[in-house]
């Protein structure tokens, strides 16, 4: 089921209902930046939570503010980086892997889609070093998730690997603690 939102446009963005998102923004362009009364999510954050690239692209063309934060002080970039495969994605990958590597291609396709989403947000001017209520940046989360495809994108956008979260850990510290040596090397090169 997922999350239920009090703002219809947020629910539509979360559920990938492009028609509804389009209708709400057409009615009033300020709906592109409306914040849900429950958790402060914007339609852009809702779409990024689920990786809905088409809706994100549409909202960005309608001047959605990429730097608005929700109650956890997270931007859309935090959620785009934290986006994981769904249970259904994993199930399809496992079931289709033996069939001409279709599962592998599905996995690669989903990963590329997430990279495109993050690149879109970076190109739109999202603050790459924005911290959430835990003091974590998108780079912290990318390191925790061992996301070797997003880390170079974030570093290229000038993500700071030395920012410490509220636990006193930088992205580099996280990579070191989790023994992600390739990520640690990437971060060291960025210093």
Swiss-Prot record:
The ANK repeat ranges on this chain: 39-68, 72-100, 101-130, 134-163
Keywords per UniProt: ANK repeat, Repeat
SMART domains according to UniProt: ANK
Entries under Gene3D superfamilies matching the protein: Ankyrin repeat-containing domain (1.25.40.20)
Tagged with keyword Calcium: no
InterPro entries in the record: Ankyrin_rpt, Ankyrin_rpt-contain_sf, ANR22
This protein's name: Ankyrin repeat domain-containing protein 22
Organism annotation: Homo sapiens (Human)
Gene: ANKRD22
